[in-house]
Amino acid sequence: MAMLAAMSREVPPVDRVGGSSFAVHLAAAPEHIATFRHELRHWLQGLTLKPAQMHDILLAAGEAVTNAIEHGSRSDATQSVSVEAALHRETVTVVVSDGGRWIESTNAALTPTQHRGRGLFLMEGLADRLAIDGTDHGTRVTMHFDVPAAAGQRTGAPLSEPREC
């Protein structure tokens, strides 16, 4: 519980723009992945998604964050990983960014080694569209998930203030 309290001070998740988007910056440490998933799940539950769609988004986003922490930031908690998600019309877009250079392009990313690289295949299979861009300034994974028109509706009141874990 103390770790969650410390994380909430360092990495406050933000639900903004009337609840149609989500943004969080987290320390690049593996122990923050579960809390990130919890916060993303909370935001997704406010959308009228089918359970399978929510599961796909959570799983793919979790894989992208794990890769950003392990590869982009080398699990260095002084580094950070940024996640932004937004609902626009009938698409949920999730963007995961880090400051490291661990992949050059989508094609390079989808060439697995014998023991690694399956998470990228998983992301490709779950997302309707996947792009991975590596630059000298970092790596960005962008995933688009097509959702039905009803997903444009939120349940409950929209949030406009940052929430703490």
Region locations from a protein language model:
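STAS-typified acidic loop motif
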Residues: A23-T35
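Conserved beta-strand-loop-beta-strand hairpin that lines the nucleotide-binding pocket
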Residues: M1-A23, I69-C165
